[in-house]
Amino acid sequence: MEYGRYAPSPSGDLHLGNLRTALLAWALARRSGRGFLMRVEDMDERSRPQFQERQLADLRALGITWDGPVQIQSQRTAGYDAAFASLWERGLLYECYCTRRDLADAARAPHGAPGVYPGTCRDLS
């Protein structure tokens, strides 16, 4: 099954921008027959459990539901490590020396698919 997801950062209460993003992600997933996951990105030092609880309660109160348990980013490091190891073993990881500006400029260039890394540093290391 394919999934949509919403990944809030619990560094404050839910605001209108968060709600808009959550509602769009949820509606698109449900309308297209996909599952919907909630993944809390709690790695930011400003994250607080009380904000997470309030944000999730607000979303539930508005009828936004998700499939399965809430996924907590800080509790998924073993999965991330396994994914990294798999990519490394297949030779698909490499260092990128581009600055954020280089990447932003490449994204604005009139070539290639939007949002796709152009591979500038792929063969340097």
Predicted regions and their residues:
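NTP-dependent nucleotidyl-transfer catalytic core
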Residues: 1-125
